[in-house]
Amino acid sequence: MNFIIATRRSKLAQVQTEIIIDLLNKKHDIECEKLLIETVGDKILEVSLDKIGGKGLFVKDIEVAMLEQRADAAVHSMKDVPYEMPKGFEIIAIPEREDVRDAFISLDNIKFKDLREGAKIGTSSRRRAAQLKLLRPDLDIVPIRGNVQTRIEKIKKENLDGIILAVAGLKRVNLDHLITDYFDTKEMVPAIGQGALGIEVMEEHPKKELFKDLDHYNSKICVLAERAFMRELDGDCHSTIGAYASIKDNIMHIIGIFERKNKIVKKEITGTKDQYEKLGIALAEHILKD
């Protein structure tokens, strides 16, 4: 059996797809090949995502490949997947999640707490920028886009004091040795779905059940809880929004942030994990009441 899996052209996207292919090969005797697609989000780098259509731009062109039957499935970073799935598509599996934290990479290995006043920090994320300002109001936030390696190179090219990147991506491309500091998930609440990969298929695909074996239940319901939170707040890349759900002894804890009335609101909620979607919605409702 031969499967074609669509993904973006970046090194990180290809590595993430190889992770899924390896997991698939351990479960089934399947030959897989990658279909590399340059999405609109990859082509337009000089403009912030919220001005050109949001993170869904990384997904739409790949879904077209599945619609045209050029691919059987797609691998995405779940943080790039809009909460409203197009008709006929579904996320069939979410494997075990990687480290969800954000990392600080500095020019000369200077710790975040030791940064000079007015230090220039690169990030294109509204979520990260807002939380950085809460931690250090003096910081000068500089928007940067591009793949992981490009952003790292911009530290020197753009005379930055440092940048913020997801730990998961750095680990997957073996660049985590460059990390200067790790942010705790309470001081820098992650993006919805950060660190998780999702396998997207068309609902009518005859072989889609083969991917279900790759599903990691706790990882999946944590991401679904976060996405329920985002859906209730109608959040997207235009929003300053983040959430992180974790499970211990069948108890789910979710921390979420959302910018409302020009103020960052942060709330937490705890409950049994079987109520994961209700917890995400309830957390959003708490924030809207603030």
UniProtKB/Swiss-Prot annotation:
How the cofactor is bound: the record states: Binds 1 dipyrromethane group covalently.
Q: List residues, modification S-(dipyrrolylmethanemethyl)cysteine.
A: 237
* Top-level taxonomic group: Bacteria
Catalyzed reactions = 4 porphobilinogen + H2O = hydroxymethylbilane + 4 NH4(+)
Keyword list (alphabetical) reads: Porphyrin biosynthesis, Transferase
Give the metabolic or biological pathway.
Porphyrin-containing compound metabolism; protoporphyrin-IX biosynthesis; coproporphyrinogen-III from 5-aminolevulinate: step 2/4
- Read off the Pfam families from this record: Porphobil_deam, Porphobil_deamC
NCBIfam families tied to this protein: hemC
Please give the name of this protein.
Porphobilinogen deaminase
Q: Name the species this protein comes from.
A: Clostridium botulinum (strain Loch Maree / Type A3)
